[in-house]
Amino acid sequence: TKDEVKIGNAAKRAMVTNPKNTISFVKRLMGADFNDENVKKMQKLATYDIVNKSGKPYVKIDDKEYSPEQISSMIVGKMKKVAEDYVGEEIKDAVITVPAWFGDAARTATKTAGELAGLNVLRVINEPTSAALAANLMEDKKDKTVVVVDSGTGTVDVSVLELSDGMAEVLASNGDVYLGGKDYDDAIVKWVVDEFKKSDDVDLTKDNMAYARVVESAEKAKIELSSSTQTEINLPYISMKDGAPLNLAMTLSRAKFESLVKNLNDRTVEKAKVAVEKAGKKYADIDCI
């Protein structure tokens, strides 16, 4: 907004009510040239304006233009503050993780974003390596071959790692920069909207505030279904019809959810298969995923 920078859940809520000034998936623009095919695709999908400035993609908000590094630095700066509040002291140094498929330009742009946020970036490392460290897969220093599947908000990255003597080598990577958690959310949103249209003859996509509530509830439902076999989606006073308020109450089972996202799961599995093949490995060679 004109008064403050909203990051995280506050920004997600603004995605529906203020889409023109809400920036998402800026990671896809990091280190890119304006004429890159990926930038052209982003221009079609983004709710905000992506403009050409000296051959580089910039994000336009009102009458100002920001580089992807500047936008990313705002997010990094927010996380720096969160970390400082947690440990109770200033944080100066950082190691930043990036997808294994990031090229040199994207890695340099990421380092720049960290520096703009006031950090001394010690290293930029691959996310799969970081995942292996976090999962304690390298502690025993035994040789093993690991597949890391990293499903983010808007991308899925699959990497095959060779772990040996406490070191990690990326043998192969594969991924899709247009497949991630948001696609799973969108599948639930579409189901809710379609079901409500059938039962109450009201299109919730026509009401920005109602649609924003559905989007928020879809993500919560997805998270709950990770540990439960079913979840309730209850949104009282979601809309009005003939002067009377309408309530939305639906039950979504895990089985139904899995059927809604089967094509997404199939795409992820296919990415993993290709990564294993690129690494020159067979399924029997994989020690863990």
Model-derived features: positions:
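Oxyanion-binding/catalytic loops of NTP- or PPi-dependent enzymes
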Residues: 1-44, 49-54, 60-74, 81-289
